Amino acid sequence: MTIEKKFVADGVRKVRVEQYLNKELKRAGYGGMDIVRTPVGTQVTIFAEKPGIVIGKGGKLVRQLTTDLSTVYGIESPQVEVQQVANPNLNAQIMAERLANALERGWYFRKAGTSVIRRVMDSGALGCEVIIAGKLTGARARVQKFVEGYIKHSGEPSESIVEKGYATAIKKLGIIGVQVKIVPPGAKLPDQFEIRADAAPAPARVVETDIFEEFDAELAAEPEPEFVEEV
């Protein structure tokens, strides 16, 4: 397998695992995952609002997840670890699921979108963007965006400091897609800089030279021009 095909295969497998965990752990407030390869296997960290539901009674559910990750999705020696989300309002995936759930329960899309924006910003986020796409009010599909604060849309910062969450709401008119982007508090923005004040500034150098003396010396060193009398 070429290196390009390997990258594509790893990306497809990660998306499949993400969809599987999102479906199985919806009641637990699934907030994303992280996969890291180690010398002894693969470390899979699951972030959830309710870790107890992920673990299950006597660890039954987490053992089932480990078996499925190994046999169905081909992850080598998976070691599943569950971590609780410190602040669910700052987790993009959890907020996307909450927004989709509110839309399914009949909330007006503007009220639901602004409510998510307000919760995220009140929790200290630097920026938040909510995108709702689908048949919102009529037969024609459209896209509605809600933005507040600082959001980066392109470049490396959009991948490193912006957290993204995706969810779908199933309604009678069709499926509504939901996307939530959050810039968490404490993120280092690309245009942010600090000016450090030196504790002891260096003293200014005083040059002991006389400009006029140097100029006179240069004139004295130059030969005098010879004038030829015209006949």
UniProtKB/Swiss-Prot annotation:
Q: Which domain of life is it from?
A: Archaea
Tell me the Gene Ontology biological-process terms attached to this UniProt entry: translation
Example GO CC term: the record gives: cytosolic small ribosomal subunit
- Can you list the disulfide-bonded cysteine pairs? none
What Pfam family is a match, any one?
A: Ribosomal_S3_C
- Give the record's subunit note: Part of the 30S ribosomal subunit.
Q: What does this protein do?
A: Binds the lower part of the 30S subunit head.
NCBIfam families found in the cross-reference section: PRK04191.1 (NF003219), uS3_euk_arch (TIGR01008)
- UniProt protein name: Small ribosomal subunit protein uS3
What is the scientific name of the source organism?
Methanocorpusculum labreanum (strain ATCC 43576 / DSM 4855 / Z)
Gene it is expressed from: rps3
